[in-house]
Amino acid sequence: MPRSRVNGNFIDKTFSIIANILLRIIPTTSGEKKAFTYYRDGMLAQSEGNYAEALQNYYEATRLEIDPYDRSYILYNIGLIHTSNGEHTKALEYYFRALERNPFLPQAFNNMAVICHYRGEQAILEGDSEIAEAWFDQAAEYWKQAIALTPGNYIEAQNWLKITKRFEFE
C-alpha cells in the first residue's frame, strides 16, 4: 500500500485526498500520476526522517517523471537528503542536476553555497587557507545567484558577502 494511504496525520490525510482528486481531474499520463505518487510518498518519508525510504521513492519518481520542471524538485529533494546525511559531493551533484532543469531554484544555489562555505571552514581547520578561499569564493558565487533570484532573502548570506568584501550591494 502506498505510504500516502497509511499516514495518520490530519493534514497529511487532507493533502493526500486533495492530491488524489487533482490527479484524477488533471489531464496527465499514468506515468506522471505514478511519478507524483512516488514524489508525494518520498516527501512524507523525508518529513518523518525515513531517508532511505524517501530516496527509494524519489529515485522511482525520477525514473517516471518526464517534465523537467517537476524533475528538478525531485532532484532537489534528493540533494537535501544527501546534505542531511553529510554526503556533500552527492548533494552538490543533485543540486546541479536540479538547476540544469530549472535554473530558478534559489534554494538549490543557497544549499550549494552552504556546502561550499562549510568546506571552506573545514579547510581552515586543516590549515589550508588557499583551499578555504577557493571554497569561500565558490560559496559567494552561489549565494550571489540565489540573491539575484530572490533579492529580499538570504540576509545572512548578504551580510557575509559584504563583510568578506565578495559582493557590493546597492
Swiss-Prot record:
The record gives the membrane topology as:
Peripheral membrane protein
Q: Where primarily located?
A: plastid
This entry carries the following GO cellular component terms, namely: chloroplast thylakoid membrane
> Mind listing the GO biological process terms from this record?
photosynthesis
The family line of this record is: Belongs to the Ycf3 family.
Biological classification of the source: Eukaryota, Viridiplantae, Streptophyta, Embryophyta, Tracheophyta
Name the gene. ycf3
Record PANTHER family = CELLULOSE SYNTHASE OPERON PROTEIN C (PTHR44943), TPR REPEAT-CONTAINING PROTEIN MJ0263 (PTHR44943:SF8)
User: Which keywords fit this entry according to its UniProt record?
Assistant: Chloroplast, Membrane, Photosynthesis, Plastid, Repeat, Thylakoid, TPR repeat
- Tell me the ranges holding the TPR repeats: 35-68, 72-105, 120-153
Protein function: Essential for the assembly of the photosystem I (PSI) complex. May act as a chaperone-like factor to guide the assembly of the PSI subunits.
Q: Where found?
A: Plastid, Chloroplast thylakoid membrane
**Name of this chain's protein:** Photosystem I assembly protein Ycf3
Domain of life, source organism: Eukaryota
One Pfam match, given by its short name, reads TPR_1
Give the matching NCBIfam families: PRK02603.1
The cross-references to PROSITE patterns, in alphabetical order and at most eight, read: TPR, TPR_REGION
